[in-house]
């Protein structure tokens, strides 16, 4: 009986853990959304375009399996906890 109970507890924990998903803020809606399996990083990418002096930097938020590579004139930060990439203006 103890073995059956222990088995049920382990199965329950495994099933609950599978149901949990990693979430990040994503643009354009700037809302928290689940990431695809294997994407366990959130990123924030900012840069200036030709309208930067009028509206500020362009901001891209999303999920990634690895931190996006550096790009000229773009600031990229990554983090590894749920919703750790809020919009800088919020």
From Swiss-Prot:
Source domain of life is Eukaryota
Q: Which Gene3D superfamilies match?
A: CD59
UniProt lists the family membership as follows: Belongs to the three-finger toxin family. Long-chain subfamily. Type II alpha-neurotoxin sub-subfamily.
What Pfam families does the entry give? Toxin_cobra-type
Lineage, highest ranks first: Eukaryota, Metazoa, Chordata, Craniata, Vertebrata
Which cell locations does it reside in? Secreted
Predominant place of localization? secreted
Q: Which GO terms describe its cellular component?
A: extracellular region
Please name the CDD domains in this protein's record: TFP_snake_toxin
Q: What is known about what this protein does?
A: Binds with high affinity to muscular (alpha-1/CHRNA1) and neuronal (alpha-7/CHRNA7) nicotinic acetylcholine receptor (nAChR) and inhibits acetylcholine from binding to the receptor, thereby impairing neuromuscular and neuronal transmission.
| Residue pairs linked by disulfide bridges in the UniProt entry | 24-42, 35-63, 48-52, 67-78, 79-84
Q: Which GO terms describe its molecular function?
A: acetylcholine receptor inhibitor activity; ion channel regulator activity; toxin activity
What organism does the record attribute this protein to?
A: Austrelaps superbus
Q: Give the keywords, sorted.
A: Acetylcholine receptor inhibiting toxin, Disulfide bond, Ion channel impairing toxin, Neurotoxin, Postsynaptic neurotoxin, Secreted, Signal, Toxin
The protein depicted here goes by the name: Long neurotoxin 1
Tissue occurrence: Expressed by the venom gland.
Q: Which residues form the signal peptide?
A: 1-21
